[in-house]
Amino acid sequence: MSCLRNYYCRAFGYKQSRSCYSRSLNREIANESSEVERRARSLRVLDIISSKSGGVSNRQDHFGFVQEFRQTDSWRFRGQAISEDFDLSRTKNGVSSVLEEVMLEDSSSSVKRDGWSFDAYGLSSAVRSCGLNRDFRTGSGFHCLALKGGFISDVYLGSSLVVLYRDSGEVENAYKVFEEMPERNVVSWTAMISGFAQEWRVDICLKLYSKMRKSTSDPNDYTFTALLSACTGSGALGQGRSVHCQTLHMGLKSYLHISNSLISMYCKCGDLKDAFRIFDQFSNKDVVSWNSMIAGYAQHGLAMQAIELFELMMPKSGTKPDAITYLGVLSSCRHAGLVKEGRKFFNLMAEHGLKPELNHYSCLVDLLGRFGLLQEALELIENMPMKPNSVIWGSLLFSCRVHGDVWTGIRAAEERLMLEPDCAATHVQLANLYASVGYWKEAATVRKLMKDKGLKTNPGCSWIEINNYVFMFKAEDGSNCRMLEIVHVLHCLIDHMEFL
C-alpha cells in the first residue's frame, strides 16, 4: 500500500494519495484491537499528515488582471457584437473562449472595426453573465474592454462590475470600482453594502447607507436586507433597531423578506420577544419565516419552544418543513440534550421525502456525544452514506475529551487531521491525548510537526456593543482603547446573569 501511495504522489499529487491511503486505513481500523495495532496506526497517520502540505487557496485576485492591463496597451477587439442577451454558453472547461473571440494582440483600439461593435450596455450584460456563471476571470477581461473602450464611466456597467467583484469575494476591489464611478445607482450602492455585510463590517455598511441617503439614489428593500444582514452577523442590536425604524419610515413593513431579515436579526441579537412579535404579526409567513424563528429558539437553548413551533408549522400554516427546518429543530435538541426527540426528528425527515445531509448527521453526532453515547456516535459516523467532514470528527473529539474516552478521541483527532492537516488546535489535542496514554514519541512528533509547519492556535474573539458601536476584544488583551468600558459592561452583564 505504501508503494501504491507513493505512486499516486508521484503521478497525481497529494489528494489522490490521501484518498487511496485513507481507504486502506478505514479497512484496517475495523480489525484493530491490540496495543501494537493502535500504535502502528498512529504512526501511519502521523506519516500521512507529516507528508501533507497546507492547502493553497484557489482564491485569485482578479482585479490584479485589470491592473496589469492598465499598465499595458496591447488589446484589440473583434467578434460579434455583444448584446443584452449575451451569455457564456461557449465556455470550455471553465475557461471562456469569449475573450479569444473579442480580443487580439498588438493593434489599435477601436470600439467599431470591420463591422463588429459593442457598447456599454452590451458589456454590462456580458459582465452579469460572467457573474452568474462564476467566470470571474472572463469578467475581469470585460473590465479591461470597458477601460479600453472608454465605457467605464457608465453607471450600469460600473454596477455590474461592483457585483462581479463582490461575488468573487474581492470586496476591497469592488470598492475600488465603486469609488471610481462618477455616478452611482441603487444597484451599486446596495451591492457595495451587501459586500461589506458579508464580512459583518456593520459600521462601514451604515456609513455607506448614510452617504447613499445624501446622494440622488433612494434605498430599496434589498438595501435594507443587506443592512440587516450586517447587523445580524455582528450582533449589533442597537444598529439593527435603527435599520428597523428606517424600514418602517420607508413603508417597507409588508415586504416578506424584510420581515424575515428582521426576525433573523432579533433572534441572533438575543431579542426573541421582538422576533416573535414580528413573526406572529405577519400573516403571509413562508418556510424562511418559520425556519428563522425555530433557529432563533434553538440558538438560545429554548428547545421546547422550537419543538412546539415546529409541530405547529404544518397544521397552522400548511407550510411543509424543509432540510433547514429540521436542522433547526435538531440543533435545539442538541443544545438541550434531548436524545430521544433528536432521534425521532432525524428519522422523521424521511416521511417528508428528505434525506439527511452532513449538517443533520453533525447535529445528531454532537447530540449523542454530549450525552456520552460515544460508541453510538462513532457507529453513526461509520455508517453515514457520505464521507464525514472535519466538523463531525471535531464534534466527536470534543465529546471524547468531556467524557474521558481517550482511544475514541485519538481516532477522531487522527481522522480530523487527515482532513485538515493545518489545524493547530487538533494538533494540540492529539498531542495531549497521546501523552495521556503514554505515547510520548507520538506526542513529540505531533508537536514537532506543529513547529515545522509554523502552526499556532489563534485566540478566540468576542464582540460587545457599547452605545450602538460593536467592539472586538480578546482574552487578556488590553490593546483596545475602550477596554475599560468593555470590562465595565462585561461586569454589568455578569452581575445581571448572577441575579437571574
Swiss-Prot record:
A Pfam family the protein falls into: PPR_1
Stretches the record annotates as Type E(+) motif: 468-498
Region of interest: Type E motif: 392-467
Highest taxon above the source species: Eukaryota
Keyword DNA-binding among record annotations: no
PPR repeats: 119-153, 154-184, 185-219, 220-254, 255-285, 286-321, 322-356, 357-387
Keywords: Repeat
GO molecular function terms noted in the UniProt entry: RNA binding
GO biological process: RNA modification
Alphabetized NCBIfam families for the sequence: PPR (TIGR00756)
Family assignment from sequence similarity: Belongs to the PPR family. PCMP-E subfamily.
Designated name of the protein: Pentatricopeptide repeat-containing protein At2g37320
Organism expressing this protein natively: Arabidopsis thaliana (Mouse-ear cress)
Upper lineage: Eukaryota, Viridiplantae, Streptophyta, Embryophyta, Tracheophyta
Gene: PCMP-E50
